[in-house]
Amino acid sequence: MSLEIERKFTVADGWQVPPGTTGEQLQQAYLSPQGAAVEFRVRSKRDARVMTVKTFDAASGAMVRQEVEFEIDDAVFTQLWELAGGDCLSKYRWNVPLEHHVATVDEYDGALAGLRVVEVEFGSLEEARSFRPPDWFGEEVTGSPAWSNRVLAASARAVPDEQGETR
């Protein structure tokens, strides 16, 4: 089990992916209900399928989570994906070098098209707290439930009908 220490921000309008930056397409599905103390996620990226289990460390604040990841085969991935009941999302991820860190920029597809967020991971809580974001980072949304991928996946599924009701 490892600690994940990160901060999350929106991406400022007008920001462009730097030339030569590499990225990859990701698909994620969430198996645990919103607000659960333990989050279960499956992810497909390139040739890998990964199961992730995250717990939230209330004592350390919103920036710190315990995380376990392990590879699963295609058949298990497909079965778990179907169990997610539509709480899925698709996004393209770029890794943008910063001076001492890497900014992970996610641009969402489908119902979330146009939404972009950036995360930076750190080796310690002190390092995370002292980080000064570059100008192209927008509002900080670390710890905001509305900006969690789990909530975004559920909101992508909630398509309004003609009367404005979600189904």
Please identify what each model-predicted range represents:
Residues M1-R167:
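Phosphate-end processing signature that detects enzymes handling 5′-triphosphorylated RNA
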